[in-house]
Amino acid sequence: MDVSRTTPTVPRHSRNALAAPAPRPTRTAESPPAAVLAQRFLAVRSATLALCAPLSPEDCAAQSMPDASPVKWHLAHGTWFFEHFALAAHARRHAPFDPAFDYLWNSYYEAVGPRHARPSRGLLTRPSLARVLEYRAHVDAQVLDLLDAPVVPDALAATLALGLAHEEQHQELIVTDVKHLLAANPLQPAYHARTPAAGAPAVPLRLVPRGGGLVAIGAEDHDEFCFDAEQPLHRAWLEPHALASR
């Protein structure tokens, strides 16, 4: 997939570029500087496009099973999150890129309204992948315009933090869904074709013993982002065990 023209060009900036709804963050930390948030936004959004770079438009449109989603849908859904929850709430005079997209790209956000059925996402040959990438670049540019300010409101910072964690979830889903899709192809295509490495003896497998004991699991309620399902920080007993060296 050619993504060379999908990185948004936005004035006034110098930039280095579960389908289920993600839980809300449990706290709002002091807002980071706008430039830091903009860099984080660009890094996460660019990483999603990088995952799609080896894929053809046909790869991005196919759905291998009802429990998977097309890559094109993942690209659009992550973009829709930022348009619906960040731009619509915080951008002045915001107009939807396409009003029909609320129906196409919503997943399970009941309060937003009806949505296209998940098992039928692979039937969405229209809009095209090119149109979805245009949508993505348009929304990215508008989000970065919002961040062209010395201070980011806490509510916007919290929404963007949640949206970026949500996008990272969909990066994982893109990889797993593409793996299932390509595995179903009798031609056995590779996601990344690599030159085979020179043969070398395998390092012997050994078990590395690890002591057990009382361990801390979960997240604390402080600066770092976490989902509510990761709280509270709690203690658990871990039995002694061993891990394979490779």
PLM features: residue spans?
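Contiguous N-terminal and early-domain "leader" segments and peripheral loops that mark the onset or edge
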Residues: 3-5, 12, 97-98, 104
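Extended beta-strand/loop cores of jelly-roll/beta-sandwich
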Residues: 36-40, 47-52, 59, 69-73, ...
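N-terminal regions that are enriched for targeting/export leaders
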Residues: 2, 8-60
